[in-house]
Amino acid sequence: MKHNALLSAAAALTVLTSCDIPLPETYVLASQSSLPEGLAYDEVTFSFFATAIHGGEITRLSLFDQEKVFYASPDPLVSFSGAHVDAERRLLWVCQVDVKTDPIPNSKVLAFDIDEGALVRSIDLGEPSFCNDLTTDADGTVYATDSALPNIYRIGADDQLEVFASSPQFAPVEPGVLGLNGLDIAPDGESLLVVKTVPPALYRVSLADPSDIAEVTFSGDPFAVPGDPRFPGPDGLEFFGDALYVVYDGGVQQLRFSDESYTHATVRTTTAVPTGLTSITVAEGRLYVIDSEVYRVWYQGQAPELPFTIRRLNPSLFGKP
C-alpha cells in the first residue's frame, strides 16, 4: 500500500512538472514559537524543509503550502539549525545542537531519508561543538561548520568524521560568541566559501588543499555594513548562478567574484526584506529566504514578529549585473 501511494505521488508530481506550476511567493508557517532557522528545498517533491530552534521539530511545506511535521525529536529541548538536501541520494542533512540541557554545547549531524521520513544516519561531533550549517559536494561528502570551535568538518560515506579545515581565523572571539556560520561550495566544485559571524568575514577554502585558506576582499558596498543594526553579522549563504548571496537579520548581500580564485568580490546590498532572516536556498530557479526572528528573540530578548515565513527573494533588488 505504501509503495503504491509513493508511485501515485510520483505520478502526480510528474504532471505538476509538465505543467510548470510556479511555487508560491510566500509560505506561512503555523508555529508561533518554533524560531525556524535552517531552510532547504527538495526538487523532487517540491518541498521546503524548515528546522527549528525551539521544539525539536523539522517542518515540511509542500506545494500549495501544505504543512506537516517531518520529524519530531524524542528530546524537544534540542535545536535544529542548518539544513541541506542531497537530492540525488534522497537525504536531508541537518545540524542538531543541544545548548539547553548543558552549558557546554554539543551537536550532531543527522541525515533523514526524505521519501521515508526516517532518521538514517547520525554523527556525533562531541563536546564542545556547535554544528551551525552544512552542505554536500557532488560525491555526497558532507561539510559542516562549528560555531564553537575553529573547525570545518568533513563526513564521508562511511560516516567517518574528520576535521577538514581549521584555522585561528575561524575561532570565536570568546566563548559563547558565534564563529563560523553558513557555507556553500562554489559552482566550479573546487572551493568552499564560509562566513564568520563575529567579526564579519568571508573565507575561501580550497577543497583540494584545505590548508589553502584566503580571506575574501571586497569592493562596492561594505561587506556586513559596519554600524548598521540590520547587519549584526552574516548568517546563511547560497550560490545562485555565479553570485553568492549572504543573509543577515535585516538584509541580503549579493557577491560577484572577480574570478574563480574566489578571493575578491563586488558587493551589492538590499534591505528591502523583512527583518529576522537566517537562511537562504534555491528552489525551482528562484531564491527563497526564511524569516525566523532568531536574532530578535535570542539576542535582543524581544518577542518575535509573527508569522514566520518563507518568501521569495528577487535578484532584481540588487540591480543589473
Tell me what each language-model feature is.
Residues 62-66, 113-117, 156-160, 206-210, ...:
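Short loop/turn segments that connect beta-strands within beta-propeller blades
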Residues 105-139, 145:
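Asp-box/WD-like beta-propeller blade repeats and closely related beta-sheet repeat scaffolds
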Residues 53, 97-99, 147-149, 197-198, ...:
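Short loop/turn segments immediately following the C-termini of beta-strands
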Residues 95-105, 292-306:
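Short, conserved, GDST-rich strand-edge loop motifs in beta-rich repeat architectures
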Residues 57-59, 108-110, 151-153, 201-203, ...:
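A short loop-to-beta-strand structural motif that recurs across blades of beta-propeller domains
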Residues 15-18:
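C-terminal motif of bacterial Sec signal peptides marking the signal peptidase cleavage site
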Residues 23-29, 67-73, 118-124, 162-174, ...:
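A short beta-strand motif characteristic of beta-propeller blades
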Residues 31-46, 53, 74-100, 125-142, ...:
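Beta-rich, blade/repeat-based domains predominating
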